[in-house]
Amino acid sequence: MAAIGVHLGCTSACVAVYKDGRAGVVANDAGDRVTPAVVAYSENEEIVGLAAKQSRIRNISNTVMKVKQILGRSSNDPQAQKYIVESKCLVIEKNGKLRYEIDTGEETKLVNPEDVARLIFSKMKETAHSVLGSDANDVVITVPFDFGEKQKNALGEAARAAGFNVLRLIHEPSAALLAYGIGQDSPTGKSNILVFKLGGTSLSLSIMEVNSGIYRVLSTNTDDNIGGAHFTETLAQYLASEFQRSFKYDVRGNARAMMKLMNSAEVAKHSLSTLGSANCFLDSLYEGQDFDCNVSRARFELLCSPLFNKCIEAIRGLLDQSGFTADDINKVVLCGGSSRIPKLQQLIKDIFPAVELLNSIPPDEVIPIGAAIEAGILIGKENLLVEDSLMIECSARDILVKGVDESGASRFTVLFPSGTPLPARRQHTLQAPGSISSVCLELYESDGKNSAKEETKFAQVVLQDLDKKENGLRDILAVLTMKRDGSLHVTCTDQETGKCEAISIEVAS
């Protein structure tokens, strides 16, 4: 038996496998260890990965990118609204669900985001099967710490639709620590770890406490306005200004030309992590003009200095939020492809001069490797080289119940505050007027602001056909159990009659 770990990011996906006591990333059929999370639709086929990304210049309206940003979200979600505006592939609402409108010329069809994610997961499964064989389908999927229940459900369903047997969803910072065996090297000590993840579209920071081999998230913060794409965009804008200076053409309003510049800027950005300069050459960029521009690392660092500053400010802000100083952090784990940037690493090192910066595992591989290790633990590998982590996941958001008081007014109660160590169990007594024959327990989640208009409903339990009472209230006992993977089981019982209803909100099978 073997196990698989998959990280589906906003801009790329990566798969690692556990085999023979070790976990490692598998290269795809193009020889790349990271696959663009891009799907392109044509008349006769669906293209996934690098080929889809390369074809976007001529097929941009039928090319889906960053699908993770819209998974499990509705049209009134602010992040979904931002995505809809920015997406080059048209997104519409149909029967209350968001859909991509794909027009291949032969037909127009609607595609749901989960199906796009399914195709990417299928590509990851195919890649894993190239080394494990087709019988290996057990997988652990990574999720951002701030994903809500609907987002986690959508991601899990997409993986299952691709043919995976989803063992568990694991939070990304927990997977990163597991990849480095943190907590296993010194199982009796206590330490605080900063997980710095600079992905394609966002910066995610987490401070984790490791105590006697147990992981716990202390604080976390995500900024969707800083990511690798923003560094690429900054460099592409510079290239556009250089082209204008040389040829008097402003191509910033030309989508095709800017897409070419973005592609060139992305390649240059990657090169500048290891080289002192990078050459950007584009054949016939605009009006038949070729473009050749050399960019030094120093120039790139100067252009991106505002982005670097935002990253450093975010670290300092999280330390303040946690009541920590830099001296309280024992290690820093780097994740996400853009954390490779040397200038950024130096700035982080300046904050934590005495702290070990962990980057020996490629930053865009560390999270799927941790997921594969977790999968290996779950399927019971006897020769796994890392002990069972005893990892404690935490609830990422507040979980609340909505009830009513004697007057019938709404009342919200927080049962699982964000950061609650999992597994956890809570009881809540809901009082409802005896004159009604049905009672509905509504479950909400929030990012911690705790005001009713900030809450998002994700489930409900309904007790029906209750005997009416002439006077007074009836007591409904709700028992909520949240497992380590974030799945929630809720039982509601009428204390007088014993009538009971239950639901499970699963995030992994």
UniProtKB/Swiss-Prot annotation:
Localization of this protein: Cytoplasm, Cytosol
Cellular component, GO, one term: cytosol
SUPFAM superfamilies found in the cross-reference section: Actin-like ATPase domain (SSF53067), Heat shock protein 70kD (HSP70), peptide-binding domain (SSF100920)
Name this protein carries in UniProt: Heat shock 70 kDa protein 14
TM ranges: none
Organism expressing this protein natively: Pongo abelii (Sumatran orangutan)
GO MF, one annotated term: ATP-dependent protein folding chaperone
Gene symbol of the encoding locus: HSPA14
Function statement: Component of the ribosome-associated complex (RAC), a complex involved in folding or maintaining nascent polypeptides in a folding-competent state. In the RAC complex, binds to the nascent polypeptide chain, while DNAJC2 stimulates its ATPase activity.
Keywords of the record: ATP-binding, Chaperone, Cytoplasm, Nucleotide-binding
Pfam families membership: HSP70
Quaternary structure note: Component of ribosome-associated complex (RAC), a heterodimer composed of Hsp70/DnaK-type chaperone HSPA14 and Hsp40/DnaJ-type chaperone DNAJC2.
Superkingdom in the source lineage: Eukaryota
Family classification: Belongs to the heat shock protein 70 family.
